[in-house]
Amino acid sequence: MEQQWLSATLKSEDGDVYARFAYHLRDVLSDSQFSRAVWSQLEALPTADLDDYMRDLDELEDAVKCGMERIHGCTMLLVLTGAGYRDLVFALRDDAEAIEEAIQSLAAEHPNRLHTKVYQGPKFGPFEALVSRVAAT
């Protein structure tokens, strides 16, 4: 399957947020097997150089994405980049096991730079509206 990412700029009270949505995976939003969401917030290392800042976030995103996708049933759907952070939103299958332990292990590899929470709930947890909004832009 060819990867296709949609991009949008969302307005928020904290400023503009640049969003990327994995359009090629949009069917996950209506798949009843994906009823949990994993939200990971990444923090960049302090730097005065914008290129270094973005490179650092890109490298951390790649490491987290690879780590989460090694977990059975985790699929990255949405990336949000704002001032000083990048959030990754993953869909998680109901049958994924040991997710909390895997996340703790991944966070230990990146101390104080990765904050992750698993959300339970139907229709991709509380983020269905956000993911759908980005997908519709």
Where do the language-model regions lie?
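Generic structural motif
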Residues: 76, 95, 114-118
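Short beta-strand->loop micro-motif that forms the acidic, two-metal-ion catalytic signature
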Residues: 88-90
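Conserved short beta-strand edge segments in small beta-sheet-based binding/regulatory domains
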Residues: 108-137
